[in-house]
Amino acid sequence: MAEFEDTTVFNFGSQKPENVRSMLKLVYEALEEKGYNPINQIVGYLISGDPAYIPRLNDARNLIRRFERDEIVEELVKDYLSDHKTDQKK
C-alpha cells in the first residue's frame, strides 16, 4: 500500500505563462530567435488558426495554443485601446 501514498507531480514545463501578455512575449522571442518576423507570424496564426506559423522552439507553439485565439485578440485590442486612451489625455 505504501506505493500509493506518494503524490505524483505532473510538470507542464518550466515556462507557464500566467496571462496572454507573458505568453506573447515568450512566443515573440522564440520567433525572433528563429529569424522570423514575429508580427507577421503571430498575425498569420491568429487569422488562420494554423499552429505551423509558430515554431516549436522554447515550446512556443504549445504556449500560444493554451489560449483561444479570440482571447489573444481581445487582450491585444484592450492593450491597444488603453494605450490609445492614455495618449489622448496628454
Swiss-Prot record:
Q: Note the SS bond partners.
A: none
- Pfam families per UniProt: IreB (PF06135)
Report the superkingdom from the record: Bacteria
InterPro entries reported in the protein's UniProt record: IreB
Q: Could you tell me which NCBIfam families the record lists for this protein? A: PRK05473.1
The entry's family comment says: Belongs to the UPF0297 family.
Give the protein name, as stated in the record.
Answer: UPF0297 protein OEOE_1166
